[in-house]
């Protein structure tokens, strides 16, 4: 069995120095691990790393009177892991067998998840140069190295805690035991430290300093971005922390976007097609923001699927509203005739990017851009013919790009 060991002992401090103390004394008002980053506690982000590394059991060392662990327990158990809370080092021993592997993360350590998975893939004690490590608040190990606040070691070493007092700080002691037991050291790459992708956070000021980069890292994926996706990313970077801290995140944004789409449909029903199309453009931007929130949560917490509706649902909603609005633009014609051209346009917008591997083709899927173009056509009284012209242009553009793509692949 693979066991995760998390600590909620060291308190939030007003400066950036100092390592976590022992378990003795009064319980801290707020441990570092319960500070929130991107709407979730540092302990929850550490749990995501542990679960991604295949941990089946989660042990949290925390003072007896500490509240706030229930969400962490629910997250662990919903992922199929066993959850245990202990108040001291000796409580760990009965939960780890000699055949187990232990993955331990120190108080307040924040690591980029993909990086942590790579560095902790094998048994190791992660270290860093002593100057930068001690300056950041990590424990000094020897003349050359400081701790990096993470390690993976055999479970048989846990039994050595029985030789120590019960009020020692478990991570620091197990780190020494692992090094004495022959677990190899591995240095965190210098560029990782320099880029701020491996941190020890002591207070809210330090949380706020790393939060923008943390959010940006988990927002954007490889590949071409639609204009509305880029704009949504900037909105989430600016307003995201406040919404995430409030606990609403993308849910409120998705609901607001749904209201805008409904208002656009109502406006079109009353003959204000230009206004309706502008509202649809705003609705798509809102849905893009909600998708960004879902992507951030999925990637930062290593979730198998987002908790919000998938982007394909938002696409169907907006396409349905656009189809209705464009159909209303042909009010005197039969329903079949009124919907034919809009159906061809929306169908080609879905089809061409799917069959053409071209970065520019991704722009065709941007419903906000489409709605803005359609609103301009409506403003100048060109909507009916404009839909047909856009459909033909998409068809010809798709044929040309597909032909170029075939020539490139054949050569």
Task: List where the protein language model places each region.
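Conserved alpha/beta core of the MobA/IspD/sugar-nucleotide pyrophosphorylase nucleotidyltransferase superfamily
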Residues: 15, 144-265
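Hydrophobic beta-strand segments of well-ordered beta-sheets in folded domains
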Residues: 1-7, 51, 55-60, 101-102, ...
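Generic detector of multi-pass transmembrane helix bundles and their immediately adjacent loops
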Residues: 308-411
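N-terminal glycine-rich phosphate-binding loop and ensuing alpha1 helix
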Residues: 1-66
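Conserved core of the sugar-phosphate nucleotidyltransferase
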Residues: 70-74, 97-99, 109-183, 286, ...
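Core alpha-helical transmembrane segments of integral membrane proteins
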Residues: 229-306, 310
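Short phosphate-binding loop-to-helix
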Residues: 63-114
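Conserved beta-strand termini and adjacent loop/short-helix elements that scaffold enzyme active sites
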Residues: 61, 86-88, 129, 186-190
């Amino acid at each position: 069995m693979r066991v995760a060991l998390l600590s909620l002992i060291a308190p939030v401090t007003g400066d950036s120095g100092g390592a976590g103390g022992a378990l003795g004394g009064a319980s801290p008002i707020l441990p570092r691990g319960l500070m929130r980053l991107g709407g979730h506690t540092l302990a929850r982000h550490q749990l995501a790393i542990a679960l991604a590394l295949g941990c089946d059991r989660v042990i949290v060392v925390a003072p007896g009177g500490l509240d706030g662990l229930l969400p962490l327990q629910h997250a662990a158990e919903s992922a199929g892991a066993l959850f245990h809370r202990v108040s001291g080092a000796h409580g760990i021993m009965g939960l780890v067998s000699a055949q187990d592997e232990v993955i331990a993360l120190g108080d307040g350590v924040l690591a980029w998840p993909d990086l942590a998975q790579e560095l902790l893939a094998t048994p190791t004690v992660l270290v860093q140069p002593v100057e930068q490590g001690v300056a950041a608040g990590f424990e000094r190990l020897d003349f050359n190295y400081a701790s990096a606040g993470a390690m993976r070691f055999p479970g048989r070493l846990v039994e050595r805690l029985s030789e120590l007092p019960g009020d020692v700080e478990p991570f620091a002691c197990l780190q020494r035991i692992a090094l004495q037991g022959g677990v190899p050291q591995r240095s965190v790459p210098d560029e990782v430290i320099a880029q701020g992708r491996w941190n020890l956070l002591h207070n809210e000021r330090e949380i706020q300093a790393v939060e923008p980069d943390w959010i940006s890292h988990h927002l954007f994926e490889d590949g071409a971005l639609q204009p509305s996706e880029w704009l949504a990313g900037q909105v989430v970077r600016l307003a995201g922390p406040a919404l995430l801290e409030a606990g609403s995140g993308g849910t409120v944004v998705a609901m607001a976007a749904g209201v805008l789409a409904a208002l656009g449909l109502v406006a079109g029903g009353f003959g204000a097609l230009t206004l309706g199309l502008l509202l649809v453009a705003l609705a798509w931007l809102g849905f893009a923001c909600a998708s960004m929130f879902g992507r951030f949560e999925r990637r930062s917490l290593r979730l198998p699927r987002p908790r919000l509706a998938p982007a394909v649902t938002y696409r169907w909603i907006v396409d349905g509203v656009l189809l209705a609005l464009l159909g209303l633009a042909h009010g005197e014609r039969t329903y079949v005739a009124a919907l034919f051209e809009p159906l061809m346009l929306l169908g080609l917008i879905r089809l061409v990017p799917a069959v053409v591997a071209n970065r520019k083709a991704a722009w065709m899927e941007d419903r906000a851009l489409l709605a803005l173009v359609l609103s301009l056509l409506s403003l100048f009284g060109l909507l009916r013919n404009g839909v047909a012209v856009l459909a033909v242009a998409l068809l010809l553009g798709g044929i040309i790009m597909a032909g170029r793509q075939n020539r490139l692949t054949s050569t």
